[in-house]
């Protein structure tokens, strides 16, 4: 089945995911395009309401339960595979691949990956993600892998929101490296193109789409200062110190987007980037991104303006974290 098959449902994993929200945005955009959406969710809770309002078909399943994926993939022509920065991605990919083969293995699968996905990545998650992609390929699935080698704007409130609000500081181990950035919505737009218009990409199973903007964390702090009307500064710290801070955040907010695997992954990547500088796969080209998706990408400044209340809200709440650096 191909993108020209407009009758079969498109399976969206991660449809209620929090960080980046690519699955939810993709579901909405597919429904706007008149496509049938089947959303895979782990449980029926309040997060499915927006999906139901869109007219999406809700299927309960878990990437760690192969049997639950069989009915989810039945009759599917296109599928979007995404997985949070967390443990278990290889098993999840194996379950997905086995279920896809059981129902015929005809679905074309778009994989939302990341620039750290590589067999020799310094990050354990990066190596695991690469292996998961290999597993999907070994199953004979028709893959288009999107290695987004950009940080999500959403990383800033997720990883640094409380320190920004409570202390006016961003702390991490990326140093003064200038990095490419993209919004979760624009990453989802790339996924939309991959599902419906794969011909817009160059030949090849693995793609490295461009980012929207090139910024150091000091520049990120400067934009925040201007938009939030208060001084925000960037403080470089060691990998170990940032990992400890992220682990404390994960402990204080169980079930949140930050978890021990994410803490290890982003602190490891931060240290590697600070040491090596800009990675070869990193490009920021807003014009090229617009040509690919058909819409102007969101800038970080526009993201902050859009999410201003998110940056300010918890300043009114008592802090559950204490700084480990002063």
Language-model features, listed with the residues they occupy:
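N-terminal Rossmann-like NAD(P) cofactor-binding module of classical short-chain dehydrogenase/reductase
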Residues: 73, 77-80, 110
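A general structural signal for well-ordered alpha-helical segments in protein cores
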Residues: 93, 129, 157-161, 217, ...
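A hydrophobic C-terminal alpha-helical subdomain
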Residues: 202, 243-326
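Conserved Rossmann-fold cofactor-binding substructure of NAD(P)-dependent oxidoreductases
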Residues: 56-76
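Oxidoreductase cofactor-interface core, primarily capturing Rossmann-like NAD(P)-dependent enzymes
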Residues: 2-50, 64-67, 85-87, 99-108, ...
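Rossmann-fold NAD(P) dinucleotide-binding segment
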Residues: 71-73, 91-104
